[in-house]
Regions:
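HhH-family (HhH-GPD) DNA N-glycosylase catalytic core used in base-excision repair
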Residues: 1-192
Length: 192
């Protein structure tokens, strides 16, 4: 894989949806909990799959999971799980669907404990600031970090599913807590 394609991090290639996600969302700091919950749902769904697979089903996930409203998702029932097993807009994996409901309940508990999921996430970062890495090659970007290790360990202890350190690291990249845009990427120095 090329490090830079058309001025961008090479992982997004030339797929229009992927490029738009890279340019408009990935690595930009997210402070609102609704979007953080959306990324948590989508990143968890990605486990074992490619990100582009989930990105292409994003609107299906939005429809299936109450526009990513954690309170509504937390109230979903076994009947909802059965309904979603027949919904074409998402990956039909019973364990992942059920874990999304469980994770929503745990997400709400974290909000109550920390004031917001954003505050909870920042608690794993030195000086409570996002990390800006200075990688020049895609091969330098790690799949996890001390922050993702600690956060995923804490989340697992709380009962979260499908959110190991690698998925957690991807979540932190997506939501701008870790900026891994390559130094030569056109998005590198854009206002976050």
């Amino acid at each position: 894989m090329q490090d830079i394609i058309n001025g961008r991090c090479g992982w997004c290639g030339t797929d229009e949806l992927y490029v738009k996600y890279h340019d408009e969302e990935w690595g930009k700091t997210v402070t609102d909990d609704k979007t953080l919950f959306e990324f948590l749902v989508l990143e968890s769904a990605q486990a074992g799959l490619s990100w582009i697979t989930i990105l292409k089903k994003r609107e299906g996930y939005r429809k299936a999971f109450c526009n990513f409203d954690a309170t509504q998702v937390a109230q979903m029932t076994d009947e909802d799980v059965e309904r979603l097993m027949h919904f074409d807009g998402i990956v039909k994996n019973r364990l992942k669907i059920k874990s999304t409901i469980t994770n929503a309940k745990l997400f709400l508990a974290i909000q109550k404990e920390f004031g917001s999921f954003y505050n909870y996430t920042l608690s794993f970062f030195p000086d409570r600031n996002p990390i800006i890495n200075h990688f020049q090659s895609l091969s330098e970007i790690p799949v996890s970090s001390p922050e993702s290790d600690a956060m995923s360990k804490d989340m697992k202890k709380r009962g979260f599913k499908f959110f190991g350190s690698t998925i957690c690291y991807a979540h932190l990249q997506a939501s701008g807590f870790i900026n891994d845009h390559l130094t030569d990427c056109i998005c590198r120095n854009q206002k976050q």
